[in-house]
Design a protein with these regions (language model features):
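Acidic and/or Ser/Thr-rich intrinsically disordered tails and linkers
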Residues: 1-67
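Short loop/turn segments that connect beta-strands within beta-propeller blades
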Residues: 67-70, 109-111, 151-154, 200
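Structural motif
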Residues: 14-20, 56-66, 102-107, 140-149, ...
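Intrinsically disordered, low-complexity regions in large eukaryotic scaffold subunits
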Residues: 1, 122-123, 132, 140-225
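Secondary-structure-rich domain cores
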Residues: 61-62, 69-119, 125
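Repeated scaffold domains used in trafficking and secretory/extracellular systems
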Residues: 2-5, 29-48, 79-90, 120-130, ...
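Conserved beta-strand element within WD40/beta-propeller blades
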Residues: 43, 50-54, 95-99, 135-137, ...
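A short beta-strand motif characteristic of beta-propeller blades
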Residues: 24-35, 72-78, 112-117, 157-168, ...
Length: 225
C-alpha cells in the first residue's frame, strides 16, 4: 500500500511473514517493523492511524493509533464467526471496515465501535481521508454506485441521499478512488479520465485525460493521495 503518508510493505522470508511501514515524513512517526503472525493482507494509513486486517473468516482488525508522538495505542478486534474483512479505510480519528456479511463498521481511533450499518451490494473500493469516507459498490448490470459520508465521533452522517451512480468511461473499469488534499472526492478509470465530484451538485467533472500525457502504450499515471 502506498499513499501520501507512507508505505506498507509485506515480506516473506524463510517461511516467516513481516510488515514494514515507512513514513515519508519521519516527524509523523518512525518506521515500524511488525511480525505478521495473523496473515494481515489489508492496510490503511493516515497521519494518525495504521489499520491492518486479515481477510480470513473470523479474522482480526489491528490498529495502531499514533496518539502522542511515539506513544502508540494498539488495539485489536476479532470479526464474528463467519465474518471476514473485505476492505479497510482510515481517517484522522477513525477506522472503517467492510465485511463479507454486508456490514460497514466504524471504529474510533481509540478502539470504540461507533456504528454498524448494512451495505447494499458487493464492495469495490473503500477510501477515507480526514472526516470523509467513500464506498463504491457493484450495482446491477455491472454498474458502479457510491456513497459518501462524513465520519463524526457519534457515527456516520450521509452526504448522499442514497447510493449514486459512479460514472466511468465507455469500456473502462475503476482504477482509483480517493480524495484530493482539499477532501474533494475523485476517481480515475482505465480509460485515462480523472474526475472530481462537486459535493454541492453531486455532479462529476472531468479534470484530465492522462492518456493525453503519455508517450507510449505502456506508460501510465499512478495517482497518490
Amino acid at each position: 500500500m502506498y499513499n501520501s503518508v507512507g508505505i506498507v510493505k509485506s515480506h516473506e522470508s524463510d517461511g516467516e511473514s513481516s510488515l514494514d511501514i515507512e513514513f515519508h515524513d519521519v516527524a509523523v512517526h518512525h518506521a515500524l517493523h511488525l511480525a505478521n503472525k495473523d496473515n494481515l493482507s489489508l492496510a490503511a494509513l493516515s497521519p494518525k492511524v495504521l489499520a491492518l486486517a486479515s481477510t480470513s473468516q473470523g479474522g482480526k482488525l489491528i490498529v495502531n493509533y499514533f496518539s502522542s508522538g511515539d506513544v502508540n495505542k494498539e488495539w485489536t478486534v476479532e470479526m464474528m464467526e463467519g465474518e471476514a474483512v473485505t476492505g479497510v479505510a482510515a481517517g484522522d480519528n477513525w477506522v472503517a471496515v467492510t465485511t463479507s456479511t454486508s456490514h460497514l463498521r466504524i471504529f474510533s481511533a481509540g478502539g470504540i465501535q461507533r456504528e454498524v450499518i448494512m451495505t447494499p451490494a458487493s464492495l469495490v473500493s473503500l477510501v477515507g481521508a480526514g472526516e470523509r469516507l467513500m464506498v463504491a459498490w457493484q450495482g446491477s448490470q455491472q454498474e458502479l454506485s457510491y456513497s459518501l459520508y462524513r465520519v463524526r465521533l457519534t457515527g456516520l452522517v450521509p452526504l448522499t441521499s442514497s447510493p449514486q451512480p459512479l460514472p466511468l468511461s465507455p469500456d473502462s473499469e475503476l482504477y482509483w478512488l480517493g480524495f484530493s488534499d482539499s477532501l474533494t472526492a475523485c476517481s480515475a478509470d482505465t480509460g485515462g479520465w480523472v474526475r472530481a465530484l462537486d459535493s454541492r451538485t453531486g455532479l462529476w467533472h472531468p479534470v484530465i485525460n492522462t492518456r493525453d500525457h503519455t508517450r507510449g502504450r505502456s506508460d501510465f499515471h499512478y495517482i497518490v493521495r
